[in-house]
């Protein structure tokens, strides 16, 4: 699957490369699991509602979430830092 990051999500991903390699590793594990299992698997996948309907969330840590949508053969990542 292609991994497409929004500009903000890419900046957040680069932030983790500098600030915390363990969180970066967890993000990469979640992305690999999304490729394998879609909207099920590790990180407690949760369908989002309201203005984020159509997107899914997975726990990176208690504080941070990976927010994404699967569209065809692409994973569209809109956030990997903070909480929706």
Predicted feature locations:
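Enriched for short, Lys/Arg-rich terminal
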Residues: 2-4, 8-25, 29, 42, ...
């Amino acid at each position: 699957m292609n991994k497409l990051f929004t500009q903000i999500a890419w900046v957040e991903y680069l932030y983790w490369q500098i600030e915390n390699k363990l969180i970066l590793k967890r993000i990469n594990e979640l992305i690999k699991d999304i490729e394998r299992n879609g909207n099920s698997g590790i990180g407690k996948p949760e369908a989002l509602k309201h203005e984020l309907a159509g997107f899914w969330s997975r726990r990176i840590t208690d504080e941070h979430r990976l927010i994404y949508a699967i569209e065809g053969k692409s994973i569209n990542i809109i956030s990997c830092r903070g909480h929706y």
